[in-house]
Amino acid sequence: MPELPEVEVVRRGVAAHVVGRTVSEVEVLHPRSVRRHVPGPDDFATRLAGRCLTAARRRGKYMWLELGGGPEEVDAGEAVLAHLGMSGQLLVQPDEAPDETHLRVRFRFDDGGPQLRFVDQRTFGGLSLTELVSVDGVAVPEPVAHIAPDPLEPVFDLEAAVARMRKRRTGVKRALLDQTLVSGIGNIYADEALWRAKLHWARPTANLTRPQARTLLVAAVEVMQAALTAGGTSFDDLYVNVNGESGYFDRSLAVYGQAGLPCPRCGTPVRRDAFMNRSSYSCPRCQPTPRNPHY
């Protein structure tokens, strides 16, 4: 699933190519891709026609397109919320480009320029039209209101996140993946941040010192910024930017997906452990198992 850096790459592409344009038509080719829009596909398409996409924003793994224009009775505080799921893609394509095999939703614009296409092989992702609400002075889609700011947001409070993490009674990786604590971090960047901070994934959060928790969250910021510079992490063609190009941060991963290969820091073979129906990767020497692990 795309994590913060991948979604931010897509957001920047959408902002560059789509923001400021007015929707002329929306074509929903697969109703499952707008299943979270309860009034249904026809309502989704009808309410977007004539609306201007005024901004592209993101929190964690969610991005949204703020809307302006439309009839006077339309609430201006609305947005198209996008969640990419496992395989969702937002592509900017010229009108004459052939339809992708898994094209689900198409946006056409009144300037006759490139389309915005939502492509999703597994249909776990989706789009919905939702109201914006204010959370601590920031306008976010109502379905996203419960998640915490992510580490790349200006409103992210590092010291507050450190304090919240140390109050949890859980394992440190579980805490990193908890989107109500810090949003945007998934399996890949959690493992990479833990490696950089030299912490085992099952270390109890209650046993973290304040400097350790701070070091870990700073490591998460640093690794995600590095991934963003590299265009994100692509293991297959399911994650691409708006131009259909893959990221290349997978070449820089220290431990994630590197089981049996030498740790870049000490040379010890990287270990893979089962974790929450997925995997955790760590260096047994740099990240020793704690005395009282929280699995």
From Swiss-Prot:
SMART domains named in the record: Fapy_DNA_glyco, H2TH
One MF term in the entry's GO annotations: 8-oxo-7,8-dihydroguanine DNA N-glycosylase activity
Stored PROSITE patterns: FPG_CAT, ZF_FPG_2
Cofactor field: Zn(2+)
Cofactor note: Binds 1 zinc ion per subunit.
SUPFAM superfamilies: Glucocorticoid receptor-like (DNA-binding domain) (SSF57716), N-terminal domain of MutM-like DNA repair proteins (SSF81624), S13-like H2TH domain (SSF46946)
Zinc-finger ranges (FPG-type): 254-288
Reactions catalysed: Hydrolysis of DNA containing ring-opened 7-methylguanine residues, releasing 2,6-diamino-4-hydroxy-5-(N-methyl)formamidopyrimidine; 2'-deoxyribonucleotide-(2'-deoxyribose 5'-phosphate)-2'-deoxyribonucleotide-DNA = a 3'-end 2'-deoxyribonucleotide-(2,3-dehydro-2,3-deoxyribose 5'-phosphate)-DNA + a 5'-end 5'-phospho-2'-deoxyribonucleoside-DNA + H(+)
GO biological process: base-excision repair
Matching InterPro entries: DNA_glyclase/AP_lyase_DNA-bd, Formamido-pyr_DNA_Glyclase, FPG_cat, MutM-like_N-ter, Ribosomal_uS13-like_H2TH, Znf_DNA_glyclase/AP_lyase, Znf_FPG/IleRS
Residues annotated as the enzyme's active site: 2 (schiff-base intermediate with dna), 3 (proton donor), 61 (proton donor), 278 (proton donor)
Chain sites annotated for binding DNA: 102, 122, 168
Subunit structure: Monomer.
Family statement drawn from the similarity comment of this UniProt entry: Belongs to the FPG family.
Role, per record: Involved in base excision repair of DNA damaged by oxidation or by mutagenic agents. Acts as a DNA glycosylase that recognizes and removes damaged bases. Has a preference for oxidized purines, such as 7,8-dihydro-8-oxoguanine (8-oxoG). Has AP (apurinic/apyrimidinic) lyase activity and introduces nicks in the DNA strand. Cleaves the DNA backbone by beta-delta elimination to generate a single-strand break at the site of the removed base with both 3'- and 5'-phosphates.
Protein name in the entry: Formamidopyrimidine-DNA glycosylase
Record organism: Saccharopolyspora erythraea (strain ATCC 11635 / DSM 40517 / JCM 4748 / NBRC 13426 / NCIMB 8594 / NRRL 2338)
Gene from which this protein is expressed: mutM
